[in-house]
Amino acid sequence: MTELPDSTRWQLWIVAFGFFMQSLDTTIVNTALPSMAQSLGESPLHMHMVIVSYVLTVAVMLPASGWLADKVGVRNIFFTAIVLFTLGSLFCALSGTLNELLLARALQGVGGAMMVPVGRLTVMKIVPREQYMAAMTFVTLPGQVGPLLGPALGGLLVEYASWHWIFLINIPVGIIGAIATLLLMPNYTMQTRRFDLSGFLLLAVGMAVLTLALDGSKGTGLSPLAIAGLVAVGVVALVLYLLHARNNNRALFSLKLFRTRTFSLGLAGSFAGRIGSGMLPFMTPVFLQIGLGFSPFHAGLMMIPMVLGSMGMKRIVVQVVNRFGYRRVLVATTLGLSLITLLFMTTALLGWYYVLPFVLFLQGMVNSTRFSSMNTLTLKDLPDNLASSGNSLLSMIMQLSMSIGVTIAGLLLGLFGSQHVSVDSGTTQTVFMYTWLSMAFIIALPAFIFARVPNDTHQNVAISRRKRSAQ
């Protein structure tokens, strides 16, 4: 890093800025949801869509981000991403209704979808290969700090200012980042193949309408007939994509990926596993505030041990997998996370609040081990010519499953509770108890998938640079 010219180091700072903005926004909103609900006159049970609208948009737009950067140029797309993200933040702060907020969050999601993958692509183009790992470590460090600061900062702003400020703080950062991008970042382009627009649209429609249908009458107020229509449209769109991708060398995601057994198992496990894990960052601060009566700032502080546990475990995941193998690690961490979820609910409802930080720290450790193991299992056996496509599909599935997880969590709250819940009441705690029990069951289910991982899959084979950096 010290051998790089000053111009390159400034460009890396710009990318790191983008990583920080995107990672901060994914966690800062969770703590503010109850306050948003009160301000907008909505039930807290509807506020999961604030998360879903952002994450689902990211999932839909991710496949196009790398192609756009190659076609239009990394500077132009990175600048556009920052501008869209900043405008989305402004519109979020100005929103007077939930529907306005959801549209603004979707605009944020378009910017967020392009920011991180295009940032990775920028690092690949401006840094010599032998310094790539050091450069990526540098630019992703702010992305690790974002989740650490997000919950507490969100709680602090909500408690001592208003929820609008969790979006307003993005505006000066975004303006500085946009100007710096125009002045300092080169506009690399490269020859691209024709974009699979038909496949992209089919996948986008399928993912969006099925997630909307899953939210159902509880969240969107749709009639059973409308929900059935959405399900039919979503299924038809996905089936049409499969027919489109069969024997199509230009398909967005080649079906040849699924000939690799570890990829198929890893992708299925990642999808199911992140549905359960995706519920936790949303449900935990909501439960602490509405179920237990914590202040927004206190609830945000309680999330820090989980992030610290996750960051600390990343250093030894490789040794753990090499020692025990993928199947044992993934089955054990999946069942362990389910038990920890039950432990969190039990200690919280018993009033043992001093134990909660330790439980959340343990949850972060287990979750981090499982995430890292799922990612490497999915990609490690892919041939080089499919590595980039496989990584893109995995990234999309990660975002999609998180949006589905938050949607299911909102559904469970609506199923077990009324449309209006009071803070720290016996009835509310019962609603959360049943929701938490259901979550623990859902979290445990992927263990059946991971149990099918071959016994001899025990070595954590290093992922090539192309696989690590692909979109």
From Swiss-Prot:
Source taxonomy: Bacteria, Pseudomonadati, Pseudomonadota, Gammaproteobacteria, Enterobacterales
One protein family per Pfam: MFS_1
CDD domains, per database record: MFS_LmrB_MDR_like (cd17503)
Primary location recorded for the protein, binned into one broad class: membrane
Transmembrane segments: 12-32, 49-69, 77-97, 102-124, 138-158, 165-185, 197-217, 225-245, 263-283, 286-306, 342-362, 396-416, 431-451
Record-stated family: Belongs to the major facilitator superfamily. TCR/Tet family.
Protein known as: Putative multidrug resistance protein MdtD
Subcellular location: Cell inner membrane
Protein's organism: Shigella sonnei (strain Ss046)
Cellular-component GO terms for this entry: plasma membrane
MF (Gene Ontology): transmembrane transporter activity
